[in-house]
C-alpha cells in the first residue's frame, strides 16, 4: 500500500516577463493561477500531476524545494556569478568565467527567439513553484536568495553544459600551464592520447523482457553523480493531461527529468568526454600587447570590464574590477 499524502497547490503568480523584478508581495498578489497535486509513495518519492505542463512543473518545484531547498538555493550563488560572496576569492574565479562568457546576456537576448512558448511556460511555472514555496515557508536559511528567476534556472543549464562538455577542464589546463606554447606534431598526438587515458564515465544497461526470467524489462542507470551539490539526482514522477509523463532523476533547479522512463521508453545519461572544445594559441604583437595576429593583420582585442563582489572577512565585502579581452574566436 502506498502511504499517500495529497497536497493541492494554488498560486496567483507573476506576469510572463522573464527577467522581471520580483517582489515578495507580487508573487502572491499578481497574475496567473497554477494548480498541481503532489502524492508521495512509501519511499517519499513525489508523484506530481497537473492539467497543464506548467502546472506539473509548478508542483515539481514545490516538492523539490520541500525536500532539498539547500541544494536548489545554494545553486543561485553560482548561477548569479556570486560565488565570491560565498567562498571569497576562490569563488570569484568562477564568477569571472561566467561573466566573461556573457552567459546572462546570452540568455536575455535569446530567451524568446530560441525557446518555444511551451518550454517558456514550463520554465515560468517551475520558477513560480519555487517562489511560492518560499512565500509559505518563513523559517528557512535561504530567504536572501529569493525570489528565483527564469534566468537563474536557464543559467544552470548553460553552466552544466560547460562542465559536461569539457570547457572548464580545458580552461584549468591553460591555468595550470599544461598547454605548451609551441607544439610539434608528436606532442599534439601525445596530448591527444593522454586525454583519453583512464576515462571513467557513466553507463546505462537495458535488458529486454526476452532475456529475463520473469519477462520484465529492466533499465539500470548508473550515472556517477554526487549525492550532494548542483548535480545531485532528485527522483520524481511528473505527469500532465497534455501528454507529459516521466519518472526519473533531475538536478536541483531543473523542471525536466534527465534520466528515467515513461510508459514507452527508458533512457540514461552518460558523459563520454567528446572533444568539443578548441583552444587557439594567439600571436601577440610585441609592440602592442592589446593586438593579436589574424590573417596577417594585427587586430585589437575587444575589452570589457567585469565587477566581482567578494567576501573578504565576515560581513566585509568588496567589489573588484577586472578587464577581460576577447578575440574573434571568443
Where are these regions (language model features)?
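Substrate-recognition/specificity elements adjacent to catalytic centers across diverse enzyme folds
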Residues: 21-230, 241-243, 247-250, 254-256, ...
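Glycine-rich, phosphate-binding/catalytic loops in enzymes
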Residues: 236-237
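Compositionally biased, intrinsically disordered low-complexity regions
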Residues: 12-15, 154, 305
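Compact, glycine/acidic-enriched structural inserts
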Residues: 242-246, 250-316
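Sec-dependent N-terminal signal peptides
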Residues: 4-14
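Sec/Tat signal peptide C-region and signal peptidase I cleavage site
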Residues: 16-20
Amino acid at each position: 500500500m502506498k502511504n499517500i499524502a495529497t497536497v493541492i497547490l494554488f498560486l496567483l503568480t507573476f506576469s510572463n516577463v522573464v527577467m522581471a523584478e520580483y517582489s515578495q508581495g507580487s508573487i502572491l498578489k499578481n497574475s496567473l493561477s497554477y494548480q498541481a497535486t503532489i502524492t508521495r509513495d512509501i519511499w517519499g518519492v513525489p508523484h506530481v500531476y497537473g492539467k497543464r505542463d506548467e502546472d506539473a512543473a509548478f508542483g515539481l518545484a514545490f516538492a523539490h524545494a520541500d525536500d532539498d531547498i539547500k541544494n536548489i538555493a545554494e545553486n543561485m550563488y553560482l548561477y548569479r556569478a556570486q560565488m565570491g560572496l560565498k567562498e571569497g576569492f576562490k569563488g570569484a574565479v568562477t564568477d569571472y568565467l561566467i561573466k566573461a562568457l556573457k552567459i546572462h546576456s546570452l540568455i536575455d537576448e535569446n530567451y524568446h527567439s530560441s525557446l518555444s512558448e511551451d518550454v517558456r511556460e514550463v520554465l515560468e511555472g517551475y520558477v513560480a513553484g519555487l517562489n511560492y514555496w518560499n512565500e509559505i515557508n518563513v523559517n528557512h536559511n535561504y530567504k536572501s536568495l529569493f525570489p528565483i528567476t527564469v534566468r537563474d534556472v536557464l543559467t544552470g543549464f548553460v553552466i552544466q553544459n560547460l562542465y559536461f562538455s569539457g570547457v572548464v577542464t580545458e580552461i584549468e589546463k591553460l591555468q595550470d600551464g599544461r598547454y605548451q606554447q609551441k607544439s610539434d606534431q608528436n606532442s599534439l598526438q601525445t596530448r591527444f592520447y593522454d586525454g583519453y587515458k583512464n576515462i571513467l564515465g557513466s553507463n546505462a544497461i537495458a535488458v529486454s523482457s526476452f532475456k529475463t526470467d520473469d519477462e520484465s524489462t529492466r533499465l539500470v542507470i548508473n550515472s556517477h553523480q554526487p549525492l550532494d551539490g548542483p548535480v545531485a539526482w532528485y527522483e520524481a514522477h511528473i505527469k500532465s493531461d497534455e501528454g507529459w509523463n516521466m519518472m526519473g532523476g533531475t538536478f536541483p533547479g531543473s523542471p525536466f527529468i534527465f534520466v528515467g522512463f515513461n510508459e514507452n521508453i527508458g533512457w540514461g545519461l552518460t558523459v563520454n568526454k567528446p572533444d568539443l572544445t578548441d583552444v587557439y594559441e594567439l600571436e601577440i604583437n610585441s609592440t602592442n600587447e592589446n593586438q593579436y595576429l589574424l590573417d596577417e593583420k594585427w587586430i585589437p582585442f575587444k575589452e570589457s570590464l567585469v565587477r566581482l563582489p567578494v567576501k573578504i572577512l565576515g560581513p566585509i565585502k568588496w567589489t573588484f574590477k577586472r578587464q577581460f579581452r576577447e578575440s574573434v574566436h571568443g
